Regions:
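Conserved, mostly hydrophobic/aromatic
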Residues: 14, 37, 49, 166, ...
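Distinct, well-ordered alpha-helical segments
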Residues: 55-65, 81-95, 99-110
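C-terminal active-site rim and adjoining tail of enzyme catalytic domains
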Residues: 24-28, 96-97, 103-189
């Protein structure tokens, strides 16, 4: 219910606001802390921590303190993955892997493929099929994100048409802000 950037407020100041649901209705819920989200999610879901503006050291300290078991860490390069892996050997990753050079960097850094899901971009590209094949040979699922593309369409009809077009390119995982819109779509294409 607030206005402006979250980063312009302290956490205490943010507690005066309530969260709004996807239909624009004000709820009774407040903005939770990451620790509260981790506690709530235990036994319910897996959280993908894609934290862009927090130093690696801060996240590593948090990981060592909280020891979350239901978390996947989004990393943008092999160095970040190695940093977390050295502190939490069983860490699971969503690794940005959009080309063969990035794939090779993860290999050289010794990141275990069994602990990786690869974010390959906003869509599957035919020219990157050799990369997808290499990932699949290593047991890695390829994930795309429609958040920056089809999720921004104005209507639900436009969103679902975009989703269906991406399904036909055969990604293993589709990240979206609107998972409920996938109900009823043909996921077999």
């Amino acid at each position: 219910t607030g206005k402006g950037k979250v980063s312009d407020y302290t956490y205490a100041e943010l507690q005066q606001f309530n969260l709004v649901d996807r239909n624009g209705n004000v709820t009774t819920f407040k903005i939770p802390t990451l620790k509260e989200c981790l506690e709530w999610s235990k036994g319910k879901t897996i959280l993908n921590l894609d934290i862009k503006d927090v130093p690696l050291e801060v996240m590593a300290d948090f990981i060592e303190t909280e020891k979350p078991v239901n978390v996947i860490y989004t990393v943008h390069n092999a160095g970040q993955a190695r940093y977390y892996l050295d502190r939490k050997p069983d860490a699971m990753f969503s690794c940005w892997c959009k080309n063969r050079e990035e794939f090779d960097n993860y290999e050289k850094a010794g990141i275990p493929w069994k602990q990786v899901m690869a974010y390959v971009g906003p869509k599957m590209k035919p020219e990157q099929q050799p990369l997808y094949d290499a990932l699949h040979r290593n047991g890695v699922m390829c994930m795309i994100s429609v958040a920056p593309t089809h999720d921004r369409a104005k209507t639900e009809t436009e969103k679902t048409a975009g989703y269906q077009s991406e399904i036909s390119t055969r990604p293993d995982v589709i990240e979206t802000d609107y998972p409920y819109l996938f109900q009823g779509l043909d996921l077999t294409k």
